[in-house]
Amino acid sequence: MTTIQAHIFKSLFSLLLIFGLTVVASAQPNVAKGMEQTISLKVSGVCGECKHRIESTAMDVKGVKKAEWDIKTDMLVCVGSAKMDKQKIADALAKAGHKSELAAADPKGYANLPACCQYDSGADKH
């Protein structure tokens, strides 16, 4: 092999190596995104104030990146990392006074809810 051929070979090898590393590096964010999960949980509430409390309480749980509660269906949808845990979300909501399909509301938490948010008192959704 001549020195010119060796130089061309080294240059091509270097370019392929750089290209390969670039492809691998750009794929990493997609791998991390794939590790996100979505959790749905039925949570009782009746109003906009409940919505704010439910969503902010869920957001305080480790791993939750987004929380959206639908007043019509009582469904809370959380998006977050693989570390997000459905039971931990339900437990945090129970402590805040909201029952869910996984946990009963803490009596103290429920008693501390504003009167308009006490969903078991027969309050209509508003």
Cite the ranges covered by each PLM segment.
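Short, low-order "capping/linker" segments at domain edges
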Residues: 111-126
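Conserved short beta-strand edge segments in small beta-sheet-based binding/regulatory domains
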Residues: 97-109
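Bacterial N-terminal signal peptides
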Residues: 10-24
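Short, surface-exposed ligand-recognition loops at beta-strand->loop->(often short) alpha-helix junctions
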Residues: 40-50
